[in-house]
Amino acid sequence: MTLASIRRGYHVIKTLLQYGLDDVLPPKMTPWYFKLARNSLFWIRNKHKGKSGGERLKLAMQELGPVYIKLGQMLSTRRDLLSDEWANELAMLQDKVPPFDGALARQAIEAELKAPIESYFDDFDETPLASASISQVHTATLKSNGKAVVLKVLRPNVETKIQADLLLMSQTAKVIDYLLGEGNRLRPSEVIEDYRVTILGELNLKLEALNAIKLRNNFLDSDALYIPYVYEEFCYPRLMVMERIYGIPVSDIAALKAQGTNFKLLAERGVELFFTQVFRDNFFHADMHPGNIFISREHPENPYYIGLDCGIMGTLSEVDKRYLAENFLAFFNRDYHRIAQLYIESGWVSEKTDLQAFEQAIKVVCEPMFNKPLDEISFGHVLLELFRTARHFDIVVQPQLVLLEKTLLYIEGLGRQLYPQLDLWQTAKPFLEQWMAEQVGPKAMFKKVSTKLPYWSDKLPEFPELIYDNLKLGRKLLSSQQQMLDKYLKYQQQAHKSNYLLITSAILLICGTLLFNQDATLWSPYVCLISGAVLWIIGWRSRPKNRKF
C-alpha cells in the first residue's frame, strides 16, 4: 500500500466520521475492536448531529468527490438494499464538479488526435460547455464541412484516481462482509463489483461512441428518439466527437410548456421507447437521468427525445426478456403462483426455494398495490418489491436486471413528471402481449425454424456421414461393452474358483491340526495338511490379477 493510498484512506475515514456515519452502523459491524479503533480517533467528532443518516451519507459522498458521488447515485437505484429515505437522499447527488483547465483539455485532445486541433477543427472553445466527474465537453466546428460538434474528453489522470478509490472501496467492502458474516442482506462486495464494472465502462469513450452508433442505427427511422451523429474517425479511448444538439432539457418543464409541447404524447413515447429498446432491440440506455435527455425544439405538437451519454448500456438474454414480460403480465393478472414459478424457472432464485412460502411472500407484498387504480401502479416499484422479497429467498443478483430496474424507475418518474395522468399499464400492456404472442405459438415456432434453416441447410450434406459415424461409434461401444462383460464374467469365475480352493485348503489345514490331537491313524493328519497346503498354493496362484474391465 502506497503512502498516497494511506493518506486517501485516512481522508475517507475522517470524512465519514465527521458526518457521524459510525453512529448508524448495525451492532454486527461495531465489535469491541471497532469501538477501540473509533475511540483512538477521539479528535474526529460528528459535526452534523442534527441531520438524518441518509442526509449525512449524501453530504459525505459529496465531499469525497466524483467516484463516491457516482457510487451514491448508483446506490440510490438499489432500493432493494436501502430504505426509501436513504435512497431518496442519495438520488439528489449531482455529478457536477469544477471544470479543469481548457489548456489541459487541448493537450489531451491533441494527444489522442496526434495532431494540432486546428488540423481538424475550427473555433475550438477552451471554456467547457459542460463538466462532470469523468469528462468534460468543449465545442468546435468541423473544418471539413463547418458543422457544429462537441468534443468529449476524459479528465487528466482520472483512470488512476478511480482505480485507487475502487481498490480502497473493495478492501473496505471485504471488511464489512467479514463483520456482517454469511447471509447479510447488504452484500457490499457485490455492490462494489457492480459499480466497478459500470464506472470502468464509462472510462472508455471509444466504447461509448460505438454504443451511441448502435443505438442511433436502431432508431434511424423513429419519430420518438434521436441520437446525435458520432464522428467515429475522431473517437478514441479518451476522446469522442459528436454532432452538437440544441434541445430543451427534459427537466425544464416551464420551457416545454412555453413552446406548447404535447406532454401526453411525450410521456407515452418515453414508455414505448423503453419497451422497444428492451424487447425489440435488446439494447437499452441504462443512464436515462434528466441530464442525459433533451426534447426537440421543433414540432412541439409531435415532440421527440434526444438521448446523450451512452456510456452505460444494458442487454438481457432471451430467457430474461421472456421471464420479465411474463412477470409483468402475471402481476397484473394477480397470478402470484406463476410469479414465484418464474423466479425459480429463470434461475433468479434457487430451485430449492419453498414455492408456497415464496408465493405467499409475493402475495403479501403485491396484493396491497391493487388498492390503487391501475394507472397509479408503478412498474419499477413492482419490480423493486419483487426483488426485495426475493432477497429473503437468496436471490442471485442479476446486474442486467438491476440496470433495467434503475432505467424503468427513471422512465416512469419522467413520464409522470411530464404527464401525471400517464397510465403506464395501458401503454405497455399491448406491447408486452404482442411481444409474448411473437414468442409462443405457431408463428413463433415458424420464425425460429426459419432463423435456423440456413444453418441446417448448410449442415444437411454432412448428415449421412454423421449418421454413419454415429452408427459406427455405436457398434464400437456395443463391442466394447461386450468385451467388458466377458472380462467381468471371467474375473468372477476365477474369483469363485480361487475362493473355493482357499476355503477348502483352510478346512483341510484346520482338520489336519485337530487330527494331531486325536487318536487318528498316523498318516491321516499329514494327508490333510499336505492336501490343504497344495490347495492353498493352487488357490492363491489362481486369483484374478487384473480388475480392469
From Swiss-Prot:
Family affiliation: Belongs to the ABC1 family. UbiB subfamily.
Keyword Transmembrane among UniProt keywords: yes
UniProt organism field: Shewanella sp. (strain ANA-3)
Protein known as: Probable protein kinase UbiB
Keyword annotations from UniProtKB, A to Z: ATP-binding, Cell inner membrane, Cell membrane, Kinase, Membrane, Nucleotide-binding, Transferase, Transmembrane, Transmembrane helix, Ubiquinone biosynthesis
Pfam family, one: ABC1
Higher taxonomy: Bacteria, Pseudomonadati, Pseudomonadota, Gammaproteobacteria, Alteromonadales
Gene Ontology CC: one annotated term: plasma membrane
Enzyme Commission number(s) of this protein: 2.7.-.-
CDD domains recorded: UbiB
Cellular localisation: Cell inner membrane
Gene that encodes the chain: ubiB
Function, in words: Is probably a protein kinase regulator of UbiI activity which is involved in aerobic coenzyme Q (ubiquinone) biosynthesis.
